[in-house]
Amino acid sequence: MQVLTKRYPKNCLLTVMDRYSAVVRNMEQVVMIPSLLRDVQLSGPGGSVQDGAPDLYTYFTMLKSICVEVDHGLLPREEWQAKVAGNETSEAENDAAETEEAEEDRISEELDLEAQFHLHFCSLHHILTHLTRKAQEVTRKYQEMTGQVL
């Protein structure tokens, strides 16, 4: 596993981002054959498998994709929407997105900027921590499958 070279306070967003990037890079180095992760479910709390949960390969590709954005910055909004939608958007979807965006703008004007920042900052911190754990679980599960458990 890669060692963090920068030192920030424990709960600093930069620390969480660095930790996430390091864990995903470690996952990429350990998982030599990603196709082995197809159709393997990540067990939930108590060892139970959730119905409809994504397989480990889906987690692997998602975690790598998010890591690229964490390391290199956001894609332009149009590229991101096209990527998510698979380049298939209809007029109705565009109208719904514009309506949703207008609603978000109205709500955001009502909240003060500091409260918005705190909400998004806490959410980002929580999500990155959760994704870091998922990357560790994918790595551990792959090691178990290939007999690399130490």
Curated annotation (Swiss-Prot):
Residues 83-104 are annotated as: Disordered. GO terms for cellular component: cytosol; nucleoplasm; protein-containing complex. GO terms for biological process: lipid metabolic process; regulation of lipid biosynthetic process; regulation of triglyceride biosynthetic process; response to bacterium. Disruption phenotype: Decreased lipid synthesis in the lactating mammary gland. Milk has reduced triglyceride content, causing reduced weight gain in nursing pups. Adults exhibit reduced body fat content. No effect on lipid synthesis in liver. No effect on the expression of thyroid hormone-induced lipogenic genes. Keywords: Cytoplasm, Lipid biosynthesis, Lipid metabolism, Nucleus, Phosphoprotein, Transcription, Transcription regulation. It comes from the Eukaryota. Residues 90-104 have a biased composition (Acidic residues). The keyword Repeat does not apply. GO terms for molecular function: identical protein binding; molecular function inhibitor activity; protein homodimerization activity. Belongs to the SPOT14 family. This is Thyroid hormone-inducible hepatic protein. The gene is Thrsp.
